[in-house]
Each structure stands twice: as C-alpha cells, then as structure tokens.
Amino acid sequence: MPKRVLQGVVVSDKQDKTIVVKVERRFTHPVMKKTVRRSKNYHAHDENNAAKVGQTVFIEESRPFSKLKTWRLVEGEARDVAATEA
C-alpha cells in the first residue's frame, strides 16, 4: 500500500528535528453546495532541520517517531512561498 503524501505550509520550526505543517483541504458541503476550506496541523520529522517557516513542503506517512509525529518531511521538496509570489 503506498504511503500518503500531503502538501502544506510550515507554521513552526522551533522544535529540534520537528516541524508543524498546516495542511488545507477543500470539499463541497453536502447541503449548502458551497466549497468549504478546513485545515489541520501535522507534526513531521525533519532530520536535518532544513524546513523554515513559510515554506511549502511535502510530508509522507511513516513509522511513529513519537506520540504526535507519524509523518516525515520528503527531502528536497521544500520551496519558499515568498519567492514564488515575487
């Protein structure tokens, strides 16, 4: 079974070897037929402390690293949001 991969924005990199990634999903409300946005924060393992706040990153499922960390950063996938908007 393939591992799930999610794309999100780093909201915190203050912990050692850990980042917090905000992943946003969209769905159509079943009654109102309106597109609704929901977000969730995931703790992910960042072995080299490479990701910085504001970067768009990909994370994938992995073995549990701790109580909260069951995702890891996909290496070489971080890109700065500010650089892409300019």
Swiss-Prot record:
CDD domains: Ribosomal_uS17. One of its GO terms (biological process) is translation. GO terms for molecular function: rRNA binding; structural constituent of ribosome. It comes from the Bacteria. Gene3D superfamilies: Nucleic acid-binding proteins (2.40.50.140). GO terms for cellular component: cytosolic small ribosomal subunit. InterPro entries: NA-bd_OB-fold, Ribosomal_uS17, Ribosomal_uS17_bact/chlr. Keywords: Ribonucleoprotein, Ribosomal protein, RNA-binding, rRNA-binding. Pfam families: Ribosomal_S17 (PF00366). Belongs to the universal ribosomal protein uS17 family. Part of the 30S ribosomal subunit. One of the primary rRNA binding proteins, it binds specifically to the 5'-end of 16S ribosomal RNA. This is Small ribosomal subunit protein uS17. The gene is rpsQ.
